[in-house]
């Protein structure tokens, strides 16, 4: 089965991360569950810095309702990586992020995944429309269609 290409040029924003000692598992590479932590860090850092998300006192919060990851190459401590981020789908109350983990400066991803947030009212836990500042932040990195990428 041929893997789809996940190239650096297909991602619009990058979050630098340094792997940590405890990221490695018994097999000497970053454990698969740790990639989800990297995704969470990249998405939430972006939303806080660019969209004004207030994770401590804001009226809305983002709940992860779906996530997945495909692994192509191992990474290990100590490495500097960059998590590429683009927005795959922007709905009324949900966002699908498309993410990829790259070794610093490399063009081909070591892993790629998706992460879906539904934004909810902090008190009621009911879905709400994405506030305009967050929506604008997401629109900045909405991914082009595969056909547009080939142009």
What are the residue ranges of the model-derived segments?
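Catalytic strand-loop segment that frames the active site of acyl-thioester-processing enzymes
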Residues: 1-49
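Short, acidic, Ser/Thr-enriched surface-loop or helix-capping motifs
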Residues: 25, 103-104, 121-122
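Hydrophobic beta-strand-centered segment that forms part of the acyl-chain substrate-binding groove
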Residues: 46-95, 110-113
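A short acidic/small-residue loop/turn micro-motif
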Residues: 117-119, 135-136
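Conserved small/polar residues in nucleotide/adenosyl-binding loops
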Residues: 141-146, 150
């Amino acid at each position: 089965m041929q893997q789809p290409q996940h190239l650096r040029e297909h991602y619009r924003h990058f979050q630098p991360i340094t792997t940590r000692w405890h990221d490695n598992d018994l097999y000497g590479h970053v454990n698969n569950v740790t990639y989800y932590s990297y995704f969470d860090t990249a998405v939430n850092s972006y939303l806080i810095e660019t969209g004004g998300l207030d994770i401590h006192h804001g009226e809305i919060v983002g709940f992860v309702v779906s996530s997945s990851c495909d692994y192509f190459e191992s990474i290990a401590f100590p490495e500097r990586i960059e998590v590429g981020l683009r927005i795959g789908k922007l709905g009324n109350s949900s966002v699908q992020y498309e993410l990829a983990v790259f070794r610093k400066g490399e063009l081909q991803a070591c892993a790629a995944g998706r992460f879906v947030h539904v934004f909810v009212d902090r008190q009621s836990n009911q879905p709400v429309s994405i506030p305009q500042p967050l929506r604008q932040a997401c629109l900045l990195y909405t991914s082009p269609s595969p056909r547009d990428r080939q142009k």
